[in-house]
Amino acid sequence: MFTMKKSLLLLFFLGMISLSLCEQERGADEDEGEVEEQIKRSIWEGIKNAGKGFLVSILDKVRCKVAGGCNP
């Protein structure tokens, strides 16, 4: 009976160790996903800001030509 308890206790601890290692690895994977998401978000923000600037400058030029007099 005593050896059976020892082996069950050993299996329990080994299972807990493997479970904690899996949780640590999963946490590392989630961190990588967050970094990738932040990179994608920053790239899209840059593209969006560049597009806004380009469109504003084009619209200013069109408005200037339609209205007539423009200040250089």
From Swiss-Prot:
Show the propeptide residue ranges.
Answer: 23-42
Tissues with expression: Expressed by the skin glands.
List the cysteine pairs that form cystine.
C64-C70
Record's keyword annotation contains Nucleotidyltransferase: no
Per the record, the similarity remark reads: Belongs to the frog skin active peptide (FSAP) family. Brevinin subfamily.
**Its function?**
Antimicrobial peptide. Active against the Gram-positive bacteria S.aureus FDA209P (MIC=9.8 ug/ml) and B.subtilis ATCC 6633 (MIC>64 ug/ml), and the Gram-negative bacteria E.coli O111 (MIC=19.6 ug/ml) and E.coli ATCC 25922 (MIC=9.8 ug/ml). Not active against the fungus C.albicans.
Position of the signal peptide: 1-22
Q: What is this protein called?
A: Brevinin-2GHc
Q: In which domain of life is the source organism classified?
A: Eukaryota
| InterPro entries in the record | Antimicrobial_frog_2 (IPR012521), Frog_antimicrobial_propeptide (IPR004275)
Instruction: Show the Pfam families listed in the entry.
Output: Antimicrobial_2, FSAP_sig_propep
One Gene Ontology CC term in the entry: extracellular region
Please provide the record's keywords in A-Z order. Amphibian defense peptide, Antibiotic, Antimicrobial, Disulfide bond, Secreted, Signal
In which compartments does the protein localize?
Answer: Secreted
Q: Name one process (GO BP) from the record.
A: defense response to bacterium
